[in-house]
Structures are given as C-alpha cells and as structure tokens.
UniProtKB/Swiss-Prot annotation:
Function: Kills the larvae of dipteran insects by making pores in the epithelial cell membrane of the insect midgut. Acts on mosquitos and black flies.
Post-translational modification summary for this protein: Active after proteolytic processing.
Name assigned to this protein: Type-1Aa cytolytic delta-endotoxin
Assigned protein family: Belongs to the cyt1/cyt2 endotoxin family.
Top-rank lineage group of the source organism: Bacteria
UniProt GO MF annotations: toxin activity
Underlying gene: cyt1Aa
Record key words, sorted: Plasmid, Sporulation, Toxin, Virulence
Name of one Pfam family that matches: Bac_thur_toxin
GO CC, alphabetical: extracellular region
C-alpha cells in the first residue's frame, strides 16, 4: 500500500501521522459528549517545548466546538467552524481568528489522491505562513489518512461513522494542529479542522481505500486559524500543569 510520505507501512498502522525526522508531538485529548467521552486528535508542531502546555490548553478549549452533524451522519461529531468562532472569543489570554473556511469539495469517479490534493489546497490557504517543511509533511500525512488507511483507524476516536446506504458511506474526521515555529514568530497558531465526508462506496471498500483507488466524494471542510501570543508554561497555574501531565485536561 503506497502512502504519500513514504513512511513504512508498519509505522502508519501504529501512528498514521508519523513522518521521518518529524518534530511533531501527537496528543489525544478528551472531548465532552452527552453519551460518552471521545478523543480529538491533536498534532502539535512545537519548536520550543516550553509552549507545549499552551498547545494543550488551546486544543482543550476547541474541543467544545465539536457538535452533532446533520441527519446523514447520525450521532457523529465534527468540528463546527461557527461554534469555533464563538469559543475563540472566550479564550484567555486573548487571541484572534486570522482566517476561517466552510467549503465543499467534490469529485466524480476520480482517484482518491485527487481529492487529497484538493483538500490540501484548502487547508494550506488556512494555515498560510506557518507552512514550514515539517508542517507540510504533517498536514499531508493527516489529510492522506483522512481518506486512506481507514481500516487501521476505524475504531479510533477522531473518526465517527455515520449512516450508510447500499452505495454510500458517511463519516466525520476531526484533527487539530497547534503550531509554534520560526514562521509563527511571537504567536501560536491553533487550527482545528472538521470533515464531513460522503463517499459513493460501501464501508468495506472505504476502509481499504488507497490513493490509487477511485471514488466520488462530497466533502465539507470547516476550519479556522486562531493566533494567540506565546504563553510560557510557567505562567499557567500549577493545577493546569498537573492536569496536562496526567492527561486530564
């Protein structure tokens, strides 16, 4: 099975976002749900580990922007850009939404790789100047695994399976990037992304899609880029630091 980042397949099965010589840190965080606790995948590109806690705090805040989807997706949750804008106004220290997107991307009976490239172009526009080489690697890997390698992720908490028909599978996929590097300067960028994906294939096929397979897609992408001045871990209350270490944030 081919993958765009040329990572060994065994690495993808364990961690589909792993890329060679990457500095990204992958942290799973819990989101509130009326029925159960679920996870939101957070991919953090942090040059200075002194700001890891800030990345966790931002991801924790945007967890509350995961909302139920339309009837086609049943009880699935996805990141909502409008809800994310509301939450951005409540985050302290104060930051600002730099850009946001709510866009549909479609294709008819074309290779999965074509859809991946279309989605990448949308998200590259949202991320903007934060796109260092390693960030592009992580973004490409994350988007690739939104559409492929799904059998290895089918029970993971960042993917929600919606209603199925005889010829269509619906699912949502949620991921969040926190970025602090030379390109971001004195701020951290937090970029939550929610996908609603309708694909004209049965689930058994979708689970084993590769980039060479062909399918028709209707994908809704909702995302925003939130910029917050850098906050040293020492500036957070000790209770927040303890919670982050224990994974209870």
């Amino acid at each position: 099975m081919e993958n765009l980042n040329h990572c060994p397949l065994e690495d993808i099965k364990v961690n589909p976002w792993k890329t060679p010589q990457s500095t990204a840190r992958v942290i799973t965080l819990r989101v509130e749900d009326p029925n159960e606790i679920n996870n939101l995948l957070s991919i953090n590109e942090i040059d200075n580990p002194n700001y890891i806690l800030q990345a966790i705090m931002l991801a924790n805040a945007f967890q509350n922007a995961l909302v139920p989807t339309s009837t086609d997706f049943g009880d699935a949750l996805r990141f909502s850009m409008p809800k994310g804008l509301e939450i951005a106004n409540t985050i302290t220290p104060m930051g600002a939404v730099v850009s946001y997107v709510d866009q549909n991307v479609t294709q008819t009976n074309n290779q999965v790789s074509v859809m991946i490239n279309k989605v990448l172009e949308v998200l590259k526009t949202v991320l903007g100047v934060a796109l260092s080489g390693s960030v592009i690697d992580q973004l490409t890997a994350a988007v690739t695994n939104t559409f492929t390698n799904l059998n290895t992720q089918k029970n993971e908490a960042w993917i929600f399976w919606g209603k199925e028909t005889a010829n269509q599978t619906n699912y949502t996929y949620n991921v969040l990037f926190a970025i602090q590097n030379a390109q971001t300067g004195g701020v951290m960028y937090c970029v939550p992304v929610g996908f609603e994906i309708k694909v004209s294939a049965v689930k058994e096929q979708v689970l084993f899609f590769t980039i060479q397979d062909s399918a028709s897609y209707n994908v809704n992408i909702q995302s925003l880029k939130f910029a917050q001045p850098l906050v040293s871990s020492s500036q957070y209350p000790i209770a927040d630091l303890t919670s982050a270490i224990n994974g209870t944030l």
